[in-house]
């Protein structure tokens, strides 16, 4: 942590394909709620936004990028789980999502995950939603890609019946679909989003947790939300940091 502050630069992994949370803009820099959280943390280290190196980090490479030191932290719709805690350390959560489903607007036979039996269900390799479907809904035909955007065209052309990931991610795709897609049913899991850092860097984790508690209280967290995901989604409840 001190080395980052002294260097005045930081490398942050985030998604480049998720509207509202992490999406590459035409200007060549990512935008979204995760990106704003990353900027706040960097800023509190004394690092200007222009000295952040953003690295595209998909679900399958979040842990490898942290372990190898390719990134200093990951802010990428990254669900905290006990299994992942064995590999990386998590600060947060800074947002609580839930797994949901997205279909074509014309689909009317999928409303709960129990309806997925025999359906082609698209998700992403290395993701919590994919693991949940494989474990709890084995009669679904799971189709895995490297990124959620890779699921969109198969959904359009009928190769898959449904896309599943966190509700807020799907909301971003629906918002950009001009009525083509819809989110169906209610969230059926709890997905607390955390900030991933190196497993042994407990000092950095604790410091980020302090930053999160601070921005929950001073309004910067809510402002970051309202400027990004909050354009489409309602204001969320303030999470409680898990100082495990």
Please report, for each region that a protein language model flagged, where it lies by residue.
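Extended ligand-binding regions for polar small-molecule ligands
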Residues: 35, 44, 107, 127, ...
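Extracytoplasmic small-molecule ligand-binding "clamshell" domains
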Residues: 1-74
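Ligand-binding clefts/hinges and TM-proximal coupling segments of bilobed small-molecule sensing domains
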Residues: 128-143, 183, 213-244
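Acidic, polar ligand-binding/catalytic clefts
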Residues: 39, 51-115
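A ligand-binding cleft/hinge motif common to bilobed small-molecule-binding domains
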Residues: 61, 77-86, 132-135, 156-190
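Bilobed "Venus flytrap"/periplasmic-binding protein-like clamshell domains
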Residues: 17-19, 30-45, 79, 97-152, ...
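Short, Asp-centered acidic motifs that coordinate Mg2+ and/or phosphate
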Residues: 10-11, 72-73, 161-162, 181, ...
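Periplasmic-binding protein-like
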Residues: 95-103, 171-212, 231-244
């Amino acid at each position: 942590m001190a080395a980052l502050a002294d260097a005045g630069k930081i490398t942050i992994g985030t998604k480049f394909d998720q509207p509202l949370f992490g999406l590459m803009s035409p200007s060549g820099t990512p935008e979204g709620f995760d990106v704003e959280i990353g900027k706040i943390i960097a800023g509190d280290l004394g690092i200007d936004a222009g000295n952040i190196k953003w690295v595209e980090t998909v679900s399958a490479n979040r842990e490898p990028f942290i372990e190898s030191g390719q990134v200093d932290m990951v802010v990428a719709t990254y669900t905290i789980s006990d299994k992942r805690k064995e590999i990386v350390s998590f600060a947060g959560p800074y947002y609580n999502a839930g797994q949901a489903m997205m279909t074509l607007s014309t689909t009317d036979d999928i409303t709960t995950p129990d309806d997925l039996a025999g359906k082609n269900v698209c998700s992403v390799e290395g993701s919590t939603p994919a693991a949940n479907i494989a474990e709890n809904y084995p009669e679904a035909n799971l189709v895995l890609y490297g990124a959620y955007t890779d699921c969109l065209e198969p959904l359009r052309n009928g190769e898959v019946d449904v896309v599943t990931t966190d509700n807020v991610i799907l909301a971003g795709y629906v918002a950009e679909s001009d009525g083509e897609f819809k989110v169906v049913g209610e969230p059926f899991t709890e997905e607390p989003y955390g900030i991933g850092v190196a497993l042994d860097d407990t000092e950095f984790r604790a410091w980020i947790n302090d930053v999160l508690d601070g921005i929950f209280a001073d309004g910067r967290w809510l402002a970051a939300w309202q400027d990004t995901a909050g354009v489409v989604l309602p204001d969320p409840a303030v999470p409680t940091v898990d100082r495990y």
